[in-house]
UniProtKB/Swiss-Prot annotation:
Phosphorylated. Residues 36-51 have a biased composition (Acidic residues). There is a cross-link at residue 552 (Glycyl lysine isopeptide (Lys-Gly) (interchain with G-Cter in SUMO)). This is Replication protein E1. InterPro entries: Helicase_SF3_DNA-vir (IPR014015), P-loop_NTPase (IPR027417), PPV_DNA_helicase_E1_C (IPR001177), PPV_DNA_helicase_E1_N (IPR014000), PPV_E1_DBD (IPR046832), PPV_E1_DBD_sf (IPR046935), Rep_E1_papillomaV (IPR016393), Znf_lg_T-Ag_D1_dom_sf (IPR037102). Residues 180-346 are annotated as: DNA-binding region. GO terms for molecular function: ATP binding; ATP hydrolysis activity; DNA binding; DNA helicase activity. SUPFAM superfamilies: Origin of replication-binding domain, RBD-like (SSF55464), P-loop containing nucleoside triphosphate hydrolases (SSF52540). ATP-dependent DNA 3'-5' helicase required for initiation of viral DNA replication. It forms a complex with the viral E2 protein. The E1-E2 complex binds to the replication origin which contains binding sites for both proteins. During the initial step, a dimer of E1 interacts with a dimer of protein E2 leading to a complex that binds the viral origin of replication with high specificity. Then, a second dimer of E1 displaces the E2 dimer in an ATP-dependent manner to form the E1 tetramer. Its EC number is 5.6.2.4.
Length: 643
């Protein structure tokens, strides 16, 4: 049904039109009454005559009007949509934006919408505008703040800030803009309040000095590790303190290399320090915090790289410029890697020098040799070359093996008299022989009979090659035998290892042996398997990973709480053993202090005093028999060539 012209339609027609025609001014022509929303004094100008569409339908103007209405509606819809996109983020558009940032190609081939979980933005450096005004997080540099002083509309930031109020559970975001009158230290406290303080400091360091901080230092995970050289970078130092730092640091250090740079955070001080004594990171941090008057967290503290040539060249080159203040003697690790003369002196590692060091210091353990030789790297060129080598473990093993070969050959060529003299020369203290004699008398042992048996014992006479010290517990048997064994450099064997075929192997590398605390089971084992060993005749000993070794058993001492001479089951051992009984408890002068001290110095004096009674060869006779008296050398000497 066709609608009538004008505004006199039914109520349903007004509802279909949207209801906005009801606010039109209504005039009753019969009585000339004016509606309340229209001015009475206003004159009619005729400008609103075209407001009512009274055209005749079908005149041909419907199509342009409909097209204009469609274009207007599209423009309005686009404007509203743009406004919605600015103030209310669409879930679909946000998800597609994130997926676009992660991988545009992957988003282009996706067939459906993926999960709406939050994803990290990979290619966006600045956070997107949320649409709720110019809210801003804490900035990292003052340049970023000055660039955002005004928003897109040209209004100040303070006029554009919006505070979130209500129960949405989100914290208010405010703008932190440093004022022009704020000092450098105050700015640092604000600027360094970031999520990763250390990363911020490292980034600022590289911008100022042009090199990465960790390219010059090595990292100590523990803050308790001590070191004499430290690299310190301090941020936010006052200008007056930075100027006087060279004088302030001198009482604490032997060497200082100080560089000062000016930045937006204040003065940045970069130092290479050598302290008077070794300090750990905590001590250095407290010391520098006290001198510079800054928090400890505003400093980077690590030890320098001692074997890095680029790092040494950096310190050497910057020390020559006018931007550094240096005092003290340059550390040797910088000199060694930068000066031409020191570089030419670097030589290749020589194993013979290491073997000679192990031989001279009587080192036959790999761990001891590796540790002690590495400590000589600062003063010995060969030790420094050893540390620079990639075959340190192989060199240590080979050096110890060669040292053992030399020691074994030297020991086998010596007689017992020569060996006692050799061991006595290693003792520099002066002792007294009387405590040994007094201890034997305290135990009821006649000194003359002991010397007679001891003389045959040292010579290795068959059937007299073993001395047994018998007695109850706590009488000093092990103390007496251990002191003699330590002086003569002997070996200890234990019956606990008798299940192994190699438990007698230590006897092949010693001049004297000790079997401590022999039990009845041990005596039964000796009676069955080791009779020839006690006789002093040649026996065959099995060695691990080596062929059987035939040797004459060295003199053997045995301590026991069981008297083997009183048991009939061991009657075949009676002629092979010389037994001394210790009856009395071991005497003490005070708790932990023996009344009769027996040590290497006392044993040295004892042998010197009893040398003739023990029928030992004199040193003069040994030299006459072909001993040159010169120390062993495994390092080739330099030949003096005439021109």
């Amino acid at each position: 049904m066709e609608d009538s012209e004008g505004t006199d339609g039914t109520e349903e027609d007004g509802c279909r039109a949207g209801g906005w025609f009801h606010v039109e001014a209504i005039i009753t022509h019969g009585q000339r009454q004016v509606s309340s929303d229209e001015d009475e004094d206003e004159t009619e100008t005729g400008e609103d005559l075209d407001f009512i569409d009274n055209r005749v339908p079908g005149d041909g103007q419907e199509i342009p009007l409909q097209l204009y209405a469609q274009q207007t509606a599209q423009d309005d819809e686009a404007t509203v949509q743009a406004l919605k996109r600015k103030f209310v983020a669409s879930p679909l558009s946000a998800c597609s934006c994130i997926e676009n940032d992660l991988s545009p190609r992957l988003d282009a081939i996706s067939l459906n919408r993926k999960s709406e979980k939050a994803k990290r933005r990979l290619f966006e450096t600045e956070p997107p505008d949320s649409g709720y005004g110019n809210t801003q997080m804490v900035v990292g540099t003052p340049e970023e703040v000055t660039g955002d002083e005004e928003s897109q509309g040209g209004r100040p930031v303070e006029d554009q800030e919006e505070e979130r109020q209500g129960g949405d559970g989100e914290a208010d975001l405010t703008v932190h803009t440093p004022q022009s009158g704020t000092d450098a230290a105050g700015s640092v406290l604000t600027l360094l309040r970031s999520s990763n303080l250390k990363a911020t400091l490292l980034s600022k360091f590289k911008d100022l000095f042009g090199v990465g901080f960790y390219e010059l230092v090595r990292q100590f995970k523990s803050s308790k590790t001590a070191c004499a050289d430290w690299v310190v970078c301090a941020y936010g130092v006052y200008y007056a303190v930075a100027e006087g730092l060279k004088k302030l640091i001198q009482p604490h250090t032997q060497y200082a290399h100080i560089q000062v740079q000016t930045s937006s955070w204040g003065m940045v001080v970069f130092m290479l320090l050598r302290y008077n004594c070794a300090k750990n990171r905590d001590s250095v941090s407290k010391n520098m915090s006290m001198l510079l008057n800054i928090p400890e967290k505003h400093m980077l503290i690590e030890p320098p790289k001692l074997r890095s040539t680029p790092a040494a060249l950096y310190w050497y080159k910057t020390a020559m410029g006018n931007g550094s203040e240096v005092y003290g003697e340059t550390p040797e690790w910088i000199v060694r890697q930068t000066l031409v003369g020191h570089s030419m002196e670097d030589e290749q590692f020589r194993l013979s020098v290491m073997v000679q060091y192990a031989y001279d210091h009587d080192i036959v353990e790999e761990s001891v040799l590796a540790f002690e030789y590495a400590q000589l790297a600062d003063v010995d060129a060969n030790a420094a070359a050893f540390l620079n080598s990639n075959c340190q473990a192989k060199y240590v093993k080979d050096a110890v093996t060669m040292c053992r070969h030399y020691k074994r050959a030297e020991r086998e060529q010596m007689s017992m008299s020569q060996w006692i003299t050799f061991r006595g020369n290693k003792v520099s203290e002066e002792g007294d022989w009387k405590p040994i004699v007094r201890f034997l008398r305290h135990q009821g042992v006649e000194f003359v009979s002991f010397l007679a048996a001891f003389k045959l014992f040292l010579k290795g006479v068959p059937k007299k090659n073993c001395i047994v010290f018998y007695g109850p517990a706590d009488t000093g048997k092990s103390y007496f035998c251990m002191s003699l064994l330590q002086f003569l450099g002997g070996a200890v064997i234990s019956y606990a290892n008798s299940s192994s075929h190699f438990w007698l192997q230590p006897l092949s590398d010693s001049k004297i042996g000790l079997l401590d605390d022999a039990t009845p089971q041990c005596w039964s084992y000796i009676d069955i398997y080791l009779r020839n060993l006690l006789d002093g005749h040649p026996v065959s000993i099995d060695r691990k990973h080596k062929t059987l070794l035939q040797l004459k058993c060295p003199p053997l001492m045995i301590t026991t709480n069981t008297n083997p001479l009183e048991e009939d089951r061991w009657k075949y051992l009676r002629s092979r053993l010389t037994v001394f009984t210790f009856k009395n408890p071991f005497p003490f002068a005070s708790p932990g202090e023996p009344l009769y001290p027996i040590n290497n110095a006392n044993w040295k004096c004892f042998f010197q005093r009893s040398w003739s009674r023990l029928d030992l060869n004199s040193p003069e006779e040994q030299d006459d028999n072909g001993n040159t008296g010169e120390p062993f050398r495994c390092v080739p000497g330099d030949v003096a060539r005439t021109v």
